């Protein structure tokens, strides 16, 4: 559905979603401003709806229909990003579901709409997992490396799925084991150390976006690091749209740099503060860990600035302009600094810390 590179890692800011559980300490950024996901491309798999909860055969019914109005879910082509690692631990299925993270939490990033949710993982395991057209298996059929295993975590780790699992007429919620390749059933309120949340991001409205609807932006960390690596990272934005200049939270400053300054230099030559709107035509942002300076030109209109002249200021600090005691012009009294040549508006005495240019 899209021209992104399958198997490539892209980063998403999930910091504002309040995902339940304990954040996986092995993520490159535990503040969740930079969470890695792997683009799987388009898969044909079933997805469940909330009505499937507590229905024994809901996965099978969804796996056998392409009717989007089907009660429990349906099978269709869709494009996914799979979390590159477990995101949260010690979290129950019901806790996630109560907050909308099992069947779909609306999420918009850089003008692209997604749903963040658990994948379907199958509901029974005899000699193989069924239904086989679940999302987990369809992703692994493309490339097993699209779902990585973290050896630093409990080897028995299971990732919550959407599906129900029944054993001796008792309902369990399904977790999927990467290492063992099988299913594991838990009570829906179980939240011990081997239950994890590893979501997918599904791109919504792919036909509206079109094949070229997504665009990749490269972030050059400029000597800084993310999770110990100084390599460039990539984010996904809407083509022919705008995106938000990313946060510096979660990034590590260059060695020996103890300042607090941060801004992005765009491939268009302009400077951007985190939170600024950036055109998607700006395909690279380079992190700058230094003061952002703006030039200042003071026109004394025939007078003389004897003291406290300024030619530039630092964003975040601002500056105080010369006052009457700093100015001199014979037979004249200083009336203040104005931003317009016709002296309209009120005089300016300072450049604010957030003033730009």
Predicted regions, residues:
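Secondary-structure capping and domain/repeat boundary segments
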Residues: 4-11, 16, 207-357
């Amino acid at each position: 559905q899209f021209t992104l590179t399958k198997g490539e890692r892209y980063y998403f800011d999930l910091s504002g979603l309040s995902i339940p559980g304990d954040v996986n300490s092995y993520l490159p950024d535990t503040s969740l401003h930079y969470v890695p996901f792997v683009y799987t491309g388009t898969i044909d798999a079933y997805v469940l709806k909330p009505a499937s909860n507590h229905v024994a055969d809901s996965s099978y019914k969804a796996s056998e229909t392409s009717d989007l109005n089907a009660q429990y879910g349906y099978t269709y082509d869709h494009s996914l990003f799979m979390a590159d690692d477990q995101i949260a631990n010690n979290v129950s299925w019901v806790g996630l579901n109560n907050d909308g993270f099992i069947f779909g939490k609306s999420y918009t990033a850089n003008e692209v709409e997604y749903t963040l949710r658990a994948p379907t993982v199958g509901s029974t395991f005899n000699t193989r997992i069924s239904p086989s057209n679940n999302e987990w298996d369809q992703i692994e059929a493309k490339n097993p490396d699209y779902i990585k295993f973290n050896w630093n975590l409990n080897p028995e780790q299971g990732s919550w799925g959407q599906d129900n699992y029944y054993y001796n007429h008792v309902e369990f919620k399904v977790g999927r084991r990467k290492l063992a390749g099988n299913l594991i059933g838990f009570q829906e309120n179980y939240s011990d150390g081997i239950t994890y949340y590893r979501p997918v991001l599904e791109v919504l409205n792919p036909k509206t976006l079109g094949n070229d609807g997504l665009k990749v932006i490269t972030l050059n960390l400029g000597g800084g690091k993310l999770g110990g690596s100084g390599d460039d990272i990539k984010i996904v934005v809407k083509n022919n749209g705008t995106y938000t200049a990313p946060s510096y939270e979660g990034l590590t400053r260059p060695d020996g740099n103890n300042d607090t300054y941060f801004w992005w230099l765009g491939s268009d030559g302009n400077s951007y503060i985190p939170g600024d709107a950036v055109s998607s035509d700006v395909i690279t942002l380079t992190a700058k860990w230094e003061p952002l300076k703006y030039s200042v030109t003071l026109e004394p209109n025939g007078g003389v600035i004897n003291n406290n002249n300024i030619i530039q200021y630092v964003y975040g600090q601002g500056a105080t302009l010369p006052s009457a005691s700093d100015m001199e012009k014979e037979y004249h009294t200083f009336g203040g600094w104005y931003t317009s040549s016709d002296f309209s508006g009120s005089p300016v005495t300072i450049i604010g810390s957030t003033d730009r240019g």
